[in-house]
Amino acid sequence: MKVIFLFILFSLLAGCSSENNKAPSVLSDFIKADYSHNQSIISCELLPDRNLSSVERLIPVFVEKLNKVRKKDDEVMFFFPIQFENSSISKFKILLNHENKVLLEEMHQTLSELSFEETALCNTEETSYGRLSLFESKFESTLAVVEMMECKYVNDFNYATMKLVFEEFIDALAKLDQKVSIVYSENLEIKSNFRWFNIFDSIESRKIFIESWQDLSVSNQMQTLFTEQSSCGASTLYKSYKVI
């Protein structure tokens, strides 16, 4: 699944200017990501005698409580892995895009009040991430297909050395005329770690997007340039339900 990420980024690196050749540490001093939100992920695993219906019944309660404290643009999404085999889903994630810690604290309090530990065991990441939307399409539904990848900059490269790449990326996506959203999320404590999100309205639209991107002549030849700056693990596909 990591192919889509590589095809996207490889093609963009062709547009990098000489500024990317400056020392990465120097660039990072004055080129920083302008995050729109903090991003936190709560990872959960269902207890053996529970199923996703047990979780879905509690979502309206989450929505009611979180709506009382959230900022206007705060978001909460439930991520359920997409499995192509006939197997039950036992793990899921709750992703929060929040302006401050109030939303996250209210989520923890709500989980406790609902005795959610009787349904699933959950752990919140110790570090938050900064969220930056690189490209955004408007989706009519609150349901989406999300492809997430864990990545790491190598050899002291960082966001500053990739900024021009992302700008070229936005231009390339606009020319493709495909409905996709792209989100970059950077670890606020370990800046070399980041996440990449590709967001589609369906599995079929993801397939069409990949085919369209592969048709771009510059995509394949940029693989070496991208791997010089970062490395990524295998991506994971999720069905995303935006509840707030």
PLM regions: where:
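Short S/T/G/P-rich N-terminal loop/turn motif that feeds into the first structured element of a domain
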Residues: 16-220, 228-244
